[in-house]
Regions:
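A short, Trp-centered hydrophobic/proline-enriched beta-strand micro-motif
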Residues: 6-21, 59-63
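A generic structural signal for short beta-strands and their flanking turns/coil linkers
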Residues: 10-12, 35-37, 55-59, 69-75, ...
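Short glycine/serine/proline-enriched coil/turn segments at secondary-structure junctions
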Residues: 23, 67-69, 120
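Hydrophobic residues embedded in beta-strands of well-ordered beta-sheets
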Residues: 24, 38-39, 117
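Hydrophobic/aromatic beta-strand elements that line small-molecule binding cavities or substrate pockets
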Residues: 29-32, 75-77
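A short mixed-secondary-structure module that forms the rim of ligand-binding clefts
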Residues: 32-67
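Charged, gly/pro-rich active-site loop segments
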Residues: 72-130
């Protein structure tokens, strides 16, 4: 898992895809943390992304590694409501503390079950990393 977290942190911004009915929706994300050997992300339960995940919990994200290499990760969203997980996200990304706290009701953290991660290149076959 560390490899995925490291790549996402190095890329600084990665793109997170959901579906809205039969339409794809993609948005930039910039926060990820590893906690208890899982890769965690966050959302706000008042957003369209949260509603879309509720309707279809399968998501994919993509991050550039270099000019010709990128990471793709997909899986099923599983929310984790424990305050200690929220606090880990806040500690890793202090900029979120101006919007959220570990005990508020809109800050949602989640990991991906059955997560699959692959590194792609225009010059070689995909490398499965999890």
């Amino acid at each position: 898992m560390n490899r995925i977290v490291n790549i996402l942190n190095q890329s600084k911004i990665f793109f997170f895809a959901t579906t809205d009915g039969n339409q794809p929706r993609v948005r930039p994300y910039n926060a990820v943390v590893e906690f208890e050997d899982k890769v965690y992300f966050y959302t706000n339960n008042h957003t369209r992304a949260f509603r879309q995940i509720s309707e279809n919990p399968f998501i994919e994200l993509c991050a550039m590694i270099s000019e010709d290499r990128w990471l793709r990760v997909n899986g099923k969203v599983v929310y984790d409501y424990r305050p200690e997980v929220k606090q880990a996200m806040l500690d890793a990304h202090p900029e979120l503390k101006s919007m959220y706290s570990a005990d508020d009701k809109i800050f949602e953290v989640f990991y991906l079950s059955n997560m699959q991660g692959t590194i792609h290149s225009n010059h070689s076959e995909p490398e499965v990393i999890c």
